[in-house]
C-alpha cells in the first residue's frame, strides 16, 4: 500500500507543491525509471549477495522510509530528483524479500506462493490509490486543517516503518 503514495500522487504532488508542468513531471518519471532500472537491472546482483537477504530487506525498507519522508518535506524542486536516489535504492528489498519467502516454501508450492503474492499486490492496488489520493485531496483542500500535500508520502513512510518493525520481529 505504501508504494502507492508515489505511484498515485507523484504527479499531483509535484504539480501542486512545485508547480511542475507535464514536461517536468515526464522528466522526473523518466529519472525514476532510470534509477529503478539501475537498481533492478544490476545493483541487486551485487548488493544482495554481499549484504545477504535479511540485511538487504532491512536496508531497503529503511531507504524507502527515508525517501518517503524526504519527499513529504521537500522544499525545492531539485530535491525531488535527489530524493529519488535513496528511494530507488530501497528497491533492493523486494527481490531479497521474495528470496526469503521462496526459501521458506517447498519447490512444489512455489506457484502457490507466487499466486498469493500476486493476489496481495492486486488488493493493495485497489486500496493504495484510494487511500493515497484521498489523503492528498484532504490535505490540499481549501478547508484542510493544515495544508500538507506531502501527507501521502508521510503515510507511506509510516506504513513502511511498520514493515521494518515486522521484518525485525520475524
PLM features: residue spans?
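A late C-terminal transmembrane helix in Major Facilitator Superfamily
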Residues: 110-140
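Short amphipathic helix-loop junctions that connect adjacent transmembrane helices
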Residues: 8-28
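Loop-to-transmembrane helix entry/capping segments in MFS-fold secondary transporters
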Residues: 22-23, 105-119, 146-149
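Intracellular juxtamembrane helix-capping segments at the cytosolic ends
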Residues: 92-106
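Helix-loop junctions at membrane interfaces in 12-TM secondary transporters
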Residues: 71-84, 93
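Helix-to-loop junctions at the C-terminal end of transmembrane segments
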Residues: 39-53, 136
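Structural signature of the two symmetry-related core transmembrane helices
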Residues: 55-70
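A membrane-interface helix-boundary motif in multi-pass transporters
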Residues: 134-160
Amino acid at each position: 500500500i505504501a508504494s502507492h503514495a508515489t505511484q498515485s500522487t507523484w504527479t499531483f504532488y509535484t504539480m501542486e507543491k512545485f508547480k511542475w508542468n507535464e514536461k517536468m513531471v515526464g522528466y522526473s518519471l523518466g529519472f525514476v525509471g532510470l534509477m529503478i532500472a539501475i537498481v533492478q537491472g544490476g545493483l541487486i546482483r551485487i548488493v544482495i549477495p554481499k549484504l545477504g537477504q535479511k540485511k538487504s530487506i532491512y536496508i531497503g525498507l529503511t531507504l524507502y522510509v527515508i525517501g518517503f519522508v524526504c519527499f513529504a518535506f521537500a522544499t525545492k524542486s531539485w530535491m525531488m530528483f535527489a530524493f529519488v536516489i535513496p528511494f530507488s535504492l530501497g528497491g533492493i528489498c523486494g527481490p531479497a524479500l521474495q528470496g526469503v519467502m521462496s526459501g521458506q516454501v517447498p519447490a512444489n508450492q512455489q506457484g502457490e506462493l507466487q499466486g498469493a503474492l500476486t493476489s496481495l499486490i492486486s488488493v493493495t492496488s485497489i486500496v493504495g490509490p484510494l487511500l493515497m489520493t484521498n489523503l492528498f485531496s484532504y490535505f490540499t483542500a481549501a478547508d484542510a486543517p493544515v495544508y500538507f500535500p506531502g501527507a501521502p508520502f508521510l503515510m507511506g513512510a509510516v506504513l513502511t516503518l511498520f514493515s521494518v518493525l515486522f521484518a525485525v520481529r520475524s
